């Protein structure tokens, strides 16, 4: 049988958002989530005799559902059940797959009914997933697929989660495998959980070239041999062609589906017929079955559990205002970290999902405000290193039209508000108009000017402790205390067990033009 068309459907960075909601409130309905995205795929694929369904990683962590599974079962089985019944053909690993530790990940991989491909992460002498490249026969055509993951994971992940692993360059791994893939396959698909370090049209760098994203380098060197180049990690929406290669990145949380159709002529020459993003929109034929509704109800009930009542409202109405000046919520976050750690200084980012706390605080509020499974470390740093850290945070700001605004470096190609930290226990002033590295002044701890040669302690999350977000000054800092409590649980414990009637002001900073 001669194949004429093959359709490839891709989701990426779903982050455990199965249901059509982001859980910010109960019983809401939004055009998102794996169930609805899968419905879009199934409706569309009917027109093709041959098709593939692909998950491009970051499926295991990131939503309240994932938090719920960890808290109640310690197993990803319910999440796996959703993926298994949707009949994915293959997937790859994302960087967040490691957040709950290697045993949890390996257990999940054993339960999945489709291959998860990753050719550039090794455990001992073999690839972690035991499968880096796989071939699929479609009619008289062979489709070769390689899975690759960003090599930058050691810069973010807790060392104990990855201590037996080695991470290799995606570029070098692809270069190594392509010759053999070309010998065995008529169609080559690269499934890369990583993104682009340069603009696809101009080739101009869009970020510091750290090796985190190698997509442009791979396309520039190997596009003539690649039919489909699937990407993720940056949560961007991309559907275009790079020379003759289809390039896809389908956003996050199941809000869009990447679709590529390849066609072959009578001489078996392969070409890209279409490359697009399918919007995930409401459909009257979409329903959620009774068993799934029951799972969602259990989750919603858990999220609505009331933890405590605060003395006053800490709602964030405007995120930028809460980043440019002290806010009751970021003050509370830093106070909790200072109390838990005993450090001189603490710092926290205000995450994209954060809305602060109303007076009555529920589990939903805590998880929406601290969605990542970060633990914490107390590091010993010099006053000079502390200043370096605050200077890095000060790079978040820029002056546009004579107003303080967010620097483009923290907005493109992917918003990185999580790489701006707000500090507690130290007062400081940021002068945005000054050159980078010279913006911070008036640093005071407990009423005394910060001595650049003196040693202080700072409580940071594990992502920062290994230099995540270009906070390299922390990488070799001695660890004074390791706090193996995740952010959400730390807040739950603090809210449950402390007198909150008087919360001291620990955040004190100014941002000036």
Description of each model-found segment:
Residues 264-362, 466, 495-513:
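A short C-terminal boundary segment appended to hydrolase-like catalytic domains
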Residues 8-15, 150-151, 300-313, 363-365, ...:
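Short, compositionally biased low-complexity segments
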Residues 59, 149-151, 351-354, 464:
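Short glycine-enriched loops at secondary-structure junctions
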């Amino acid at each position: 049988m001669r194949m004429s068309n093959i359709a490839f459907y891709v989701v990426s960075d779903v982050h455990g958002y199965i249901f059509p909601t982001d859980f910010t409130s109960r019983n809401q309905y939004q055009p998102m989530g794996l169930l609805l995205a899968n419905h879009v795929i199934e409706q569309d694929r009917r027109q093709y005799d041959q098709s593939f369904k692909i998950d491009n990683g970051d499926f295991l962590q990131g939503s309240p559902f994932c938090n719920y599974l960890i808290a109640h079962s310690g197993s990803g089985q319910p999440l796996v059940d959703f993926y298994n019944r949707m009949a994915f053909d293959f997937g790859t690993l994302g960087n967040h797959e490691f957040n709950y530790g290697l045993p949890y990940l390996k257990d999940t991989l054993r339960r999945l009914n489709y291959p998860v491909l990753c050719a550039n992460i090794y455990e001992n002498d073999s690839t972690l997933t035991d499968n880096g490249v796989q071939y699929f026969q479609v009619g008289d055509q062979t489709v070769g697929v390689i899975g690759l993951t960003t090599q930058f994971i050691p810069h973010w992940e807790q060392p104990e989660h990855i201590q037996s692993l080695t991470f290799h360059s995606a570029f070098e791994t692809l270069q190594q495998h392509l010759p053999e893939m070309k010998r065995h396959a008529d169609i080559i698909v690269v499934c890369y959980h990583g993104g682009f370090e340069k603009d696809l049209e101009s080739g101009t760098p869009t970020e510091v070239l750290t090796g985190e994203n190698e997509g442009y380098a791979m396309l520039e060197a190997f596009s003539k041999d690649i039919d489909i180049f699937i990407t993720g990690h940056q949560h961007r929406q991309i559907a275009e062609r790079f020379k003759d290669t289809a390039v896809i990145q389908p956003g996050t949380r199941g809000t869009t589906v990447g679709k590529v159709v390849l066609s072959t002529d009578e001489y078996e020459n392969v070409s890209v017929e279409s490359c697009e993003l399918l919007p995930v929109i409401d459909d009257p034929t979409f329903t959620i079955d009774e068993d799934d509704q029951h799972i969602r109800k259990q989750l919603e009930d858990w999220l609505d559990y009331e933890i405590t009542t605060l003395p006053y409202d800490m709602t964030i109405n405007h995120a930028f205002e809460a980043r440019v000046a002290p806010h009751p919520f970021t003050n509370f976050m830093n106070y909790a970290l200072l109390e838990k750690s005993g450090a001189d200084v603490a710092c926290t980012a205000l995450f994209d999902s954060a809305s602060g706390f109303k007076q009555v605080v529920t589990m939903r509020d805590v998880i929406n405000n601290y969605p990542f499974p970060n633990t914490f470390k107390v590091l010993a740093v010099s006053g000079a290193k502390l200043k370096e850290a605050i200077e890095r945070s000060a790079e978040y700001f820029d002056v546009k039209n004579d107003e303080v605004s967010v620097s483009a470096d923290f907005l493109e190609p992917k918003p990185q508000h999580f790489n701006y930290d707000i500090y507690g226990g130290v007062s400081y002033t940021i002068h945005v108009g000054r050159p980078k590295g010279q913006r911070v002044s008036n640093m005071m701890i407990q009423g005394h000017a910060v001595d650049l040669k003196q040693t202080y302690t700072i409580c940071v999350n594990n992502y920062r402790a290994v230099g995540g977000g270009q906070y390299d000054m922390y990488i070799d800092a001695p660890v004074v205390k390791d706090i193996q409590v995740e952010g959400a649980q730390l807040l739950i414990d603090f809210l449950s067990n402390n007198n909150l009637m008087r919360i001291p002001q620990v955040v004190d900073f100014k941002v000036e033009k």
